Curated annotation (Swiss-Prot):
It holds the Pfam family EPSP_synthase. Cell wall formation. Adds enolpyruvyl to UDP-N-acetylglucosamine. This is UDP-N-acetylglucosamine 1-carboxyvinyltransferase. The keyword ATP-binding does not apply. It comes from Desulfatibacillum aliphaticivorans. Disulfide bonds: none annotated.
Length: 416
């Protein structure tokens, strides 16, 4: 099994190109199921999760052609309504086919999802929303079974602004009869990107980026060409790395509007963050100031940056508190950071970090996607050589991460 080895103590400098956003690409690729004809998607990252959803779409009857960062999909032959456990268990975002299948084929049978081991992450709001659109929903033998002879618009309030729930209901509502109003929806840039795609296809989605979406159903959607937005979490990871190593890094194609919460916290920590025409430049310096963080739905501080920012705080001056309000059980990486010498204690949904002078290299184990990124960051400042095991997690969400860090001057390599 692969492992990543990081030699600590190097300052990062130079430019790094941000890949397309996985969390935007997955629902956008799933949305191709709504359309007959060839859709062409550009700037698609080459990641394990992208490969997985490609296999799932092919299983459902779509044709999928891949050429580097371009993927073409034709769902004219869509015929299968079941997303089997063998595929869905690899990635919880597979549940995104639920809405499109219900809208196109009037039924869907999707295995309950897998992916990162971060708490329960239930899909009850997806299902309740589909019921309000007129579908019948049953849970049987580990599968969600949905049937809907005709979807009709409804006024739906989400108890929490679930991202995948918002996306599933947006896609289903586009082909429903009448007007659907979705309230308390997710406001992430990936939601805005999906709305842009659906509107390009001929859908009528209004309000993306606000708490309320209004979707007027149409008879059919049309195939399009579409470019995936840059990955704000990958960008944020490199921004933290620059601040952490006293580096000077231009993160190319990072979108400042997508990263305002992180930019604010990095500046409070003492980094210089400059918004440039082609990206975001971060210059780090020490001592790092301690900063408190509370994860919140967008535009708040993203939960997917919590683990990386925690590493920055491990050698900050003073005490900082990170409160996790989105997912339970998202401090699994803490025990690995403690093995490297970090002083972190957990109390309910908060981590209290007391800054130490330095971290020490140790063999560590990645437990989920963002935790594995945080361990690479910790290795960048640790004394000695850090070995990170179970790095298949990182391949689900970061494209060529060791090459990108290496081109910035880090000593990061993969050993098979």
């Amino acid at each position: 099994m692969d492992k990543i080895i990081v030699e600590g103590g190097r300052t990062l400098s130079g430019e790094v190109q941000v890949s397309g956003a996985k969390n935007a690409a997955l629902p956008i690729l799933a949305a191709s199921l709504l359309v007959d004809g060839w859709n062409t998607f550009y700037n698609v990252p080459e990641l394990q999760d992208i490969s997985t959803i490609g296999l799932l779409l092919e299983h459902l009857g779509a044709k999928v052609e891949k050429d580097g960062h371009t993927i073409k999909i034709d769902a004219s032959g869509l015929c299968e309504t079941e997303a089997p456990y063998d595929l869905v268990r690899r990635m919880r975002a597979s549940v995104l086919v639920l809405g499109p299948l219900t809208a196109r084929l009037k039924k869907a049978r999707v295995s309950l999802p897998g992916g990162c081991a971060i708490g329960a992450r239930p899909i009850d709001q997806h299902l309740r929303g589909l019921e309000m659109l007129g579908a019948t929903v049953e849970l049987s033998h580990g599968y969600v079974e949905v049937q809907a002879e005709k979807l009709r618009g409804a006024d739906i309030y989400l108890d929490t602004p679930t991202v995948t729930g918002t996306e599933n209901l947006m896609m289903a509502a586009c082909l429903a009869e009448g007007v659907t109003i979705l309230r308390n929806v997710a406001r992430e840039p990936e939601i805005v990107a999906l709305a842009d795609l659906l509107n390009r296809m001929g859908g009528k989605v209004e309000g993306a980026g606000s708490p309320v979406l209004t979707i007027t159903g149409v008879e059919a959607l049309n195939p399009v060409e579409f470019t995936i937005i840059p990955d704000r979490i990958e960008a944020g990871t490199f921004m933290v790395a620059a601040a952490l190593t006293e580096g000077d890094v231009l993160v190319k194609d990072a979108v400042p509007a997508h990263l305002q919460a992180l930019i604010s916290k990095l500046r409070l920590a003492g980094a210089t963050v400059t918004e440039e025409g082609n990206g975001i430049r971060v210059q780090g310096k020490r001592p790092i100031c301690s900063v408190d963080v509370k994860t919140l739905p967008h535009p708040g501080f993203p939960t997917d940056m919590q683990a990386q920012f925690m590493v920055l705080m491990t050698t900050a001056k003073g005490l900082s508190v990170i409160a996790e309000t989105i997912f339970e059980n998202r401090f699994i990486h803490v025990s690995e950071l403690v093995r490297m010498g970090a002083n972190i204690s957990i109390s309910q949904n908060s981590a209290v970090i007391r800054g130490v002078k330095h971290l020490s290299a140790a063999p560590v184990m990645a437990t989920d996607l963002r935790a594995s990124a945080s361990l690479i960051l910790a290795g960048l400042i640790a004394q000695g050589s850090t070995e990170i095991h179970r790095v298949y997690h990182i391949d689900r969400g970061y494209e060529s991460i060791e090459q990108k860090f290496s081109q910035l001057g880090a000593a990061v390599r993969r050993v098979k």
